[in-house]
Amino acid sequence: MCYISELFLNLQTNFDTMGYQLAIIGGGPAGYTAAEAAGKAGLSVVLFEKKNLGGVCLNEGCIPTKTLLYSAKVYDYAKHASKYAVTVPEASFDLGKIVARKQKVVRKLVLGIKAKLIANGVNIVTGEAAVIDKNTVKCGEETYECDNLLLCAGSDTFIPPIPGVEEVDYWTHRDALDNKEVPASLAIVGGGVIGMEFASFFCSLGVKVTVVEMMDEI
């Protein structure tokens, strides 16, 4: 963070101000971290985000999955409480309430990021931004001039080219995060971090889970 702040301070000396000294497209970990550091360094900053601050990691990735996993872990402990010499009446769960808790945790963290950006003078613009040229960004009907432009557009879901996949009602990770009904069984394509977190979560809820991974190891 100190290195980033020093970098922005050095850039500041070369500015011929044209509205904002720095425009950032994308409010994920890269974008909001850079915006906060630039704001602390005294630059005028505008940050564009078409969805929610925090990007995939906070809204649709590791933070919400770990929140779901924590609920599943507590449920597991309750089911097997006798192993720890603790008596618990019949354990149960409400997936709708688990999802609601996840959303509450995510919302709190998003608001925390927003508060830090505002505290450092960053102008947050919600909407899909388009680059007109190296010094111009358009969002909605408004045009923003900038001396420097930082692109932190993030990632999107990849649907593997499996024959017939377009004919079935499949989930992406986004659907799985907001699902409020427990399936009888689930096949997960991809044994990476997010895939295995979902596998662990649904397995804890009693779902029969199969993980398909093309590599030799998960």
Where are these regions (language model features)?
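Glycine-rich flavin
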Residues: 19-20, 36-43, 48-184, 215-218
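Rossmann-like NAD(P)H-binding beta-loop-alpha module
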Residues: 181-214
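Beta1/beta-strand and adjacent pyrophosphate-binding region of the FAD-binding site
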Residues: 18-28, 184-189
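Short glycine-rich, flexible loops that bind phosphorylated cofactors or substrates
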Residues: 32, 158-159, 195
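Extreme N-terminal leader/targeting segments of oxidoreductases
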Residues: 2-22, 40-43
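N-terminal Rossmann-like FAD-binding beta1-loop-alpha1 element of flavoenzymes
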Residues: 21-46, 198-203
